[in-house]
């Protein structure tokens, strides 16, 4: 089986974007609720509970884990950028309309990976990590 460099680049970039999209939900700062539960809450090493008069907030400190994820994603984006530079990569167009065809409207997602996107993604992840 021949490994195509464009396949490596598209797989790395789709993985980076999926992890970034998933991290929106897992690395949020706090969750608010107006209820006052009577059950005791166990404290984890990365979470603490603060109670105000009006609301209760459970805050999660996921800083070190989020920074490690950003470091790994920055490294992966630099690897995909170096593969693209070494193979004289031009661009890839990935269309995800076949996966979303069960809806009454036509939904089509197009990802265009060119050198500008690869440079932007690498710089953005390195700046966010630092």
Curated annotation (Swiss-Prot):
GO cellular component: mitochondrial inner membrane
Membrane topology type: Multi-pass membrane protein
Major enzyme class: translocase
GO MF annotations, alphabetized: NADH dehydrogenase (ubiquinone) activity
Catalyses which reaction(s): a ubiquinone + NADH + 5 H(+)(in) = a ubiquinol + NAD(+) + 4 H(+)(out)
Subcellular location(s) per record: Mitochondrion inner membrane
Record's keyword terms, sorted: Electron transport, Membrane, Mitochondrion, Mitochondrion inner membrane, NAD, Respiratory chain, Translocase, Transmembrane, Transmembrane helix, Transport, Ubiquinone
Main location: mitochondrion
E.C. numbers: 7.1.1.2
Spans traversing the lipid bilayer: 7-27, 65-85, 107-127
Job description of the protein: Core subunit of the mitochondrial membrane respiratory chain NADH dehydrogenase (Complex I) that is believed to belong to the minimal assembly required for catalysis. Complex I functions in the transfer of electrons from NADH to the respiratory chain. The immediate electron acceptor for the enzyme is believed to be ubiquinone.
Family of the protein in this entry: Belongs to the complex I subunit 5 family.
UniProt name for this protein: NADH-ubiquinone oxidoreductase chain 5
Species of origin: Mesocentrotus franciscanus (Giant red sea urchin)
Gene: ND5
